């Protein structure tokens, strides 16, 4: 009989002995599931010899399966981890590698994943390369990896301004989404919003290269729009889907691990702490763990496959919390005491969260940016101040190693490097007034549209 789930299994790899729980190996590795179900002698003896793998690669695999997040910087470490993920058929290790892609390792991971048949890792690395510099493509060695990258589409910066439903016969230019045509330095119209859709105080997020809009309001009474709307750029089509069980507006909406999360928000002028999760496969919403406190308009960001929310507490405390799906809990991450006059925003890059906040009330047009290193838990402040005219920094979207921001005057692209944001280039401003929600979409080849018409200030 195979050993019980709590009996340790001895695994010899490259002359080194490892001990691991059978239940852990069976849960996470297709190789060990097949082995222990086979009744082979190694399984009965609770001793396995793996001659094809490296000891350091297997050690990394065990650490990841046990919930650790090892830093893999050396090329050998990355290659051995890819080899282990493929040989052991370990999805958790593959996901860890997907979330570890950076400009430093994307070409290596892309080649290795193509060689070992790890399609999800290949796809994540290739998407990163497609959005990066030409030098990243040049670093690829395998023709199949180069071909895979070439077949992908780059992501495009898209924006939608504040809009509330108007009678269908009225031509309302604000009822459109626009994308930045960087080659022509112009904002072009991508699609019109559905007549019933509102982006005023709505949650907007992307998931699986589709755009979702939830919880906009109409009128002075803030009547919540009853349906959600989903845009698919592949066909340029909209479809409707149910709203959360709890009507809400001014929420955070996040696409994370194949699901949408409607986080906090307000209803009938009452802030809420409840959170709901939407599964597009079933079309159903379900409640998950509440936030630690009621919150509206909370910034959220994803780093290394983790979902973070930034709360603002009395006495100028910024609190970062993380939602852990497996535990269905919000766990505290870090706090920082900083003064701000109104609003804050958050984006992620590699192991860092960047919290953008307005300065004190006498200088609210300037922003300070604080950086939380998720590995060390340390806060640092980016040198200097950043102008936040018309809320430009609150439209920040990270694409590779760059940050896109936009207001009516200009679109500014920053490079994230050497502990700061360095202005890289300037493009055309968004020609519409009002607050903006921004995101990235991969548009079909040849997508074009009329240049967005300028509208007067409200």
UniProtKB/Swiss-Prot annotation:
Pathway: Protein modification; protein ubiquitination. Expressed in skeletal muscle, heart and lung. The keyword Ubl conjugation applies. Residues 7-74 form the BTB domain. GO terms for cellular component: cytoplasm. GO terms for biological process: actin filament organization; protein ubiquitination; regulation of the force of skeletal muscle contraction; relaxation of skeletal muscle. Keywords: Cytoplasm, Kelch repeat, Repeat, Ubl conjugation, Ubl conjugation pathway. It is found in: Cytoplasm. It holds the Pfam family Kelch_1. Autoubiquitinated. The BCB domain mediates the interaction with CUL3. Component of the BCR(KBTBD13) E3 ubiquitin ligase complex, at least composed of CUL3 and KBTBD13 and RBX1. Interacts with CUL3. Substrate-specific adapter of a BCR (BTB-CUL3-RBX1) E3 ubiquitin ligase complex. This is Kelch repeat and BTB domain-containing protein 13. The gene is Kbtbd13.
């Amino acid at each position: 009989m195979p050993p019980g789930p709590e009996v340790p299994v001895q695994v010899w790899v490259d002359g080194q002995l490892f001990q691991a729980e059978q239940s852990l190996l069976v849960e996470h590795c297709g190789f060990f599931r097949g082995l222990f179900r086979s009744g082979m002698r190694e399984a009965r003896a609770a001793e396995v010899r793996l001659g094809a793998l490296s000891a350091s690669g297997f050690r990394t695999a065990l650490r990841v399966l046990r919930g650790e997040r090892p830093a893999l910087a050396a090329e050998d470490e990355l290659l051995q981890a890819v080899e282990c993920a493929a040989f052991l058929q370990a999805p958790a290790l593959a996901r860890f590698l997907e979330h570890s892609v950076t400009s430093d390792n994307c070409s290596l991971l892309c080649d290795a994943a193509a060689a070992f048949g790890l399609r999800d890792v290949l796809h994540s690395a290739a998407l990163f390369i497609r959005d990066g510099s030409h030098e990243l493509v040049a670093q690829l060695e395998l023709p199949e990896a180069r071909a895979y990258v070439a077949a992908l589409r780059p992501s495009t910066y898209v924006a939608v301004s504040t809009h509330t439903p108007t009678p269908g016969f009225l031509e309302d230019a604000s009822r459109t989404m626009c994308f930045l045509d960087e080659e022509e330095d112009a904002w072009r119209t991508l699609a019109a919003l559905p007549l019933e859709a509102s982006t005023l105080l709505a949650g907007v997020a992307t998931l699986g290269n589709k755009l979702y809009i939830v919880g906009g309001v109409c009128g002075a009474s803030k009547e919540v729009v009853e349906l959600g709307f989903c845009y698919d750029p592949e066909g340029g089509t909209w479809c409707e889907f149910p709203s959360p069980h709890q009507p809400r507006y001014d929420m955070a909406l996040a696409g994370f691990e194949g699901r949408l999360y409607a986080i906090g928000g307000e209803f009938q002028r009452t802030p809420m702490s409840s959170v709901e999760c939407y599964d597009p496969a079933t079309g159903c919403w379900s409640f998950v763990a509440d936030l630690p406190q009621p919150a509206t308009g909370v910034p959220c960001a994803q780093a290394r496959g983790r979902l973070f929310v930034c709360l603002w507490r009395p006495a100028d405390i910024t609190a970062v919390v993380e939602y852990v799906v497996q535990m269905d809990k919000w766990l505290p991450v870090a706090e920082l005491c900083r003064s701000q006059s109104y609003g804050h925003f958050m984006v992620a890059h590699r192991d860092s969260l960047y919290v953008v906040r307005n300065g004190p009330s006498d200088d609210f047009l300037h922003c300070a940016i604080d950086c939380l290193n998720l590995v060390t838990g340390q806060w640092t402040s980016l040198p200097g101040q950043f102008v936040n005219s018309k809320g430009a920094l609150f439209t920040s979207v990270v694409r590779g190693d760059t940050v896109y921001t936009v207001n009516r005057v200009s679109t500014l692209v920053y490079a994230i490097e050497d502990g700061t944001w360095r202005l890289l280039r300037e493009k055309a401003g968004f020609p519409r007034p009002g607050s903006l929600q921004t995101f990235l979409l991969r548009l079909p080849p040849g997508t074009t549209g009329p240049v967005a018409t300028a509208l007067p200030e409200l």
